[in-house]
């Protein structure tokens, strides 16, 4: 009887441990969580595409505007810069893109002050069109990591379409993807630690 109790306790402990590990490996929305170190490892296997929602919008905040009312706040600019410093610690080489709105261009510019931002209006088209925009960029830069600043509805669409999950990104939340044999795969949600 004691042996059965010990086995039961061990089994329950093991299941609890699995639950804790799973909680840290998966987001509450069902997407795998990909931190900076994991992203760096993925980028060694194949070039990655990281899509970020723009930083805090000026027109939806009481925080001080960076400049234009259609752009981002000073806080948003500082948050984008902080994210850029964290991410580029491990991912040194990448091309940087933004949709053609002030808020995405400012977010990308503050993310990496030393990089040229390529503006492409196609990153504002959400739905299946976002995939052709990503593929076009991937074709132009086949062996490079790509970072794109876009919009929450684009990220929500990708998560729903690729993984059938609801994803409601906050400012500067991101998704990690890669292209394999011409097909786009959603690897998971980028998380900051």
From Swiss-Prot:
<comment type="function">
    <text>Catalyzes the dephosphorylation of heptose(II) of the outer membrane lipopolysaccharide core.</text>
</comment>
<dbReference type="GO" id="GO:0016791">
    <property type="term" value="F:phosphatase activity"/>
</dbReference>
<dbReference type="InterPro" id="IPR011310">
    <property type="entry name" value="LipoPS_heptP_Pase"/>
</dbReference>
<feature type="signal peptide">
    <location>
        <begin position="1"/>
        <end position="25"/>
    </location>
</feature>
<comment type="similarity">
    <text>Belongs to the phosphoglycerate mutase family. Ais subfamily.</text>
</comment>
<keyword id="KW-0732">Signal</keyword>
<keyword id="KW-0574">Periplasm</keyword>
<dbReference type="GO" id="GO:0008653">
    <property type="term" value="P:lipopolysaccharide metabolic process"/>
</dbReference>
<protein>
    <recommendedName>
        <fullName>Lipopolysaccharide core heptose(II)-phosphate phosphatase</fullName>
        <ecNumber>3.1.3.-</ecNumber>
    </recommendedName>
</protein>
<dbReference type="GO" id="GO:0042597">
    <property type="term" value="C:periplasmic space"/>
</dbReference>
<comment type="pathway">
    <text>Bacterial outer membrane biogenesis; lipopolysaccharide metabolism.</text>
</comment>
<keyword id="KW-0378">Hydrolase</keyword>
<dbReference type="InterPro" id="IPR029033">
    <property type="entry name" value="His_PPase_superfam"/>
</dbReference>
């Amino acid at each position: 009887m004691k042996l059965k109790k010990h086995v039961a306790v061990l089994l329950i402990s093991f299941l609890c441990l699995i639950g804790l590990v799973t909680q840290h490996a998966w987001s509450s929305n069902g997407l795998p969580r990909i931190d900076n170190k994991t992203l760096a490892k993925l980028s060694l296997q194949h070039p990655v595409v990281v899509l970020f929602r723009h930083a805090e919008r000026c027109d939806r905040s009481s925080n001080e505007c960076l400049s234009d009312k259609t752009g981002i706040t000073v806080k948003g600019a500082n948050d984008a810069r902080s994210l850029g410093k964290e991410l580029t610690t491990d991912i040194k080489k990448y091309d940087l893109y933004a949709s053609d709105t002030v808020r995405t261009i400012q977010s990308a510019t503050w993310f990496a002050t030393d990089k040229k931002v390529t503006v492409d209006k196609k990153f504002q088209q959400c739905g299946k069109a976002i995939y052709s925009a990503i593929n076009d960029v991937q074709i132009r830069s086949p062996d490079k990591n790509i970072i794109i600043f876009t919009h929450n509805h684009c990220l929500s669409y990708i998560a729903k379409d690729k993984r059938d999950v609801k994803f409601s990104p906050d400012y500067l939340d991101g998704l990690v993807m890669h292209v394999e044999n011409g097909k786009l795969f959603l690897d998971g949600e980028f998380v900051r630690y």
